Regions:
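Short polar catalytic/cofactor-binding loops
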Residues: 7-10, 34-36
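Glycine-rich beta-strand-centered segment in the early N-terminal region that forms part
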Residues: 19-35, 48-102, 109-112
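NAD(P)H dinucleotide-binding glycine-rich loop of Rossmann-like/cofactor-binding domains
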Residues: 90-169
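Extreme N-terminal starter segment of soluble prokaryotic enzymes
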Residues: 1-2
Length: 170
């Protein structure tokens, strides 16, 4: 499959990588849209993202996709669901992971399935991103491009809460 990589000099390249293999608690997702993150993606391209120094690297994290296959324990996602944040976990051949969502396919993890099978938080199998990988319900009426903006909105809302802003405050 095709993915977008960056080298240590900031050169972008469309590359071929293997289609990800999903596990029993994961689903395979076909990418529909992926936004450009001014923070993460741009820092990875310019080599300034803290502790991310192994290049070449697969880029992208603000993705939306459609579930096309799922593992036998997955209950939070159904085939055809539109989901947030499919990633490529771990290294893919010579490429390290900058989350890798600028790829044709990614993986989402079913947090409930992991937890119910003894692989919850604190285990090597679990990733905290599984909590954020959620279904975009059809009744929301969002296109895939619009849905990818939810990632940015979540980050903004998190910052507002972290700084303690309240309603009706200047």
């Amino acid at each position: 499959m095709k993915a977008l990589s960056v080298d240590q000099n900031g050169k972008l390249e469309v590359c071929d990588v293997p289609k990800p293999v999903y596990g029993d608690c994961q689903a395979l997702v076909k990418t529909l849209s992926c936004g450009v993150c001014n923070g993460t993606d741009m820092k990875l391209i310019h080599g300034s993202f803290k502790n991310m120094t192994h290049y070449p690297m697969l880029l992208g994290h603000e993705a939306v996709g459609q579930v096309v296959e799922k593992g036998k324990y997955v209950t939070s996602f159904e085939i055809g669901d539109i989901v947030l944040l499919p990633f490529l976990y771990g290294d893919v051949g010579k490429y390290s992971s900058g989350w890798g969502a600028y790829a044709e396919y990614g993986i989402v993890g079913d947090a409930k399935a992991y937890i119910s099978h003894g692989m919850g938080p604190g285990t090597k199998e679990f990733d905290d991103s599984f909590y954020a990988q959620t279904v975009i319900k059809p009744e929301y009426g969002l296109t895939a491009v619009e849905a990818s903006m939810i990632v940015t909105f979540r980050e903004v809302l998190s910052a507002i809460r972290r700084f303690g802003f309240q309603a009706n405050q200047d």
